[in-house]
Amino acid sequence: MLFEESDLLKALPEQFFAGLVAKVNAKVAEGADVINLGQGNPDQPTYDHIVEALCLSAKNPASHKYSQFRGNRPFKEAAASFYKKHYGVNLDAEREICVMGGAKIGLVELPLALMNPGDLLLLPDPGYPDYLSGVSLGRVTYETFPLTAENDFLPDLDAIPEETARRAKFIYINYPNNPTGAVATKAFYEKLVAWAKTYEVGVVSDLAYGALGYQGYENPSFLSTPGAKDVGIEFYTFSKTFNMAGWRLAFAAGNDQMIEALNLIQDHLFVGIFPALQEAGIAALLDPKSEEAVAQLNATYDSRRDAFVQAAAKIGWQAFPSRGSFYAWMPVPEGYTSESFADLLLEKVHVAVAPGKGFGPAGDAYVRIGLLVEPERLVEAVNRIANLHLFNN
């Protein structure tokens, strides 16, 4: 008997990061010393007090039962308190927060929950590749808006055709930005809220890197903008702020109608989040030790960015001056595409980077560097690349 994938699965886009990992693994299997700067996987451990909270709760038999479908109230109250303290946003813990096993789940399921086949979704180019999974699964259409260096990789809302804006159901934004490291300003968010109200477009803010700012920069939340909850929601993941990428914990916050739709689809797909994981999440959000740890984490990324960018500048390779995330967005040398340049680096000097084309056509003139190894290895990576004499060195 033969079983065939459904048409829905066949229509899914290629998993960009899976292909990247396969290339790196193949080179490592050959015995190469690969410096892997191609992924966005935090290399630092989860903070001790969070792990301890998980272990303590996991030993409690009450944690072994089914959790509340829509998240335990103490966790949602902790999320609301976190947003109030850090962003000045008031949230109703029951009506304006949705708990989920990672922000990717919510970002992918939103088109299924709030859009109909054929509805239009606006996406950034370059942008997080997995946004397209939601497009395919929801059978919606999409158009992109370019993020350019000339506009500091922020959307030019005035350049979106009026006819497109009026047809659009939702727009996704992501700041600090993956892959560019650009950040959004309060003025931009104010303009975005006004634009969304004018054209009746829902806003979906992906705040995955919200706590990560270089040289003390504090990223604003979209929800802190007056009127933001009238038009949208924001996803907050524990992966980057608390080094919990493998734990799979996140929440969405904001507009109560959008939150209700996400809760409803999750009622049918999942049976809550492991209670001990939620207790660990509470420790992450509320324990003062987290603030100290995040400050140290930002200092670590500061030193790494400085080491890489300064070494790259010495060989004539100039970085976009990112202010958030843990990435460097680097131009490819003349005569190369992002893929051909990335393939050259992996093959010739065993340095893995992420081709910008994987984030959209507008990214093809760049590669993304993950600052997720020690400064010495970052400098070594630049020194290896320097031996190819592709820049003015």
Enumerate the predicted regions with their spans:
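Conserved core segment of the aminotransferase class I/II
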Residues: 227-299, 306, 310, 389-390
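Helix C-cap/helix->beta junction micro-motif
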Residues: 27-30, 138, 198-199, 315, ...
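PLP-dependent enzyme catalytic core of the Aspartate aminotransferase-like
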Residues: 81, 335, 344-354, 359-393
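Conserved core of the PLP fold type I
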Residues: 63-194, 211-212, 219-223, 378
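Conserved glycine-rich beta-strand-loop-beta hairpin in the small C-terminal domain of fold type I
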Residues: 282, 298-309, 319-331, 363
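A short helix->loop->beta-strand "cap" motif at the edges of active sites that frequently abuts
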Residues: 119, 140, 198-201, 229-230
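N-terminal small-domain helix-loop-helix segment of the aminotransferase-like
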Residues: 2-101, 109, 284-287, 391-393
